[in-house]
């Protein structure tokens, strides 16, 4: 599957890499895998595999203008689902926002609830 990254995601990633709260996402392995949460999610996207319930991936609603911007960035013409997952389990605060379509995955944002839903 194709994976794309938004400009805003790249800015978010630079910011959170310096936050100790995110060390476990990029440097510690999961209890059910030798991979870190970040590696596990990216490998799942690349292979088209479903994510385990641990990540609590669920659809969220985006505005029509935001969906339009995603369509322009990805060239996608079919239905786009915007998803939210929790790297650190259902009650965690380390989130990834991404869109899922027939073409693949487009990573939109990464951060905490307060970073992403102001």
Task: Please give the residue ranges for each predicted region.
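Basic, Lys/Arg-enriched alpha-helical interface segments
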Residues: 1-92, 100-108, 113-118
């Amino acid at each position: 599957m194709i994976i794309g990254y938004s400009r805003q995601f790249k800015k978010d990633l630079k910011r959170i890499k310096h936050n100790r709260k995110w060390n476990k996402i990029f440097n510690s392995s999961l209890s059910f895998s030798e991979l870190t949460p970040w590696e596990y999610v990216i490998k799942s996207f690349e292979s088209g595999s479903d994510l385990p319930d641990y990540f609590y991936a669920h659809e969220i609603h985006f505005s029509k203008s935001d969906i339009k911007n995603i369509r322009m960035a990805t060239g996608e013409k079919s239905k786009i689902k915007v998803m939210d997952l929790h790297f650190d389990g259902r009650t965690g605060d380390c989130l990834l926002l991404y869109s899922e379509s027939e073409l693949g995955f487009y990573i939109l944002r990464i951060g905490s609830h307060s970073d992403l839903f102001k």
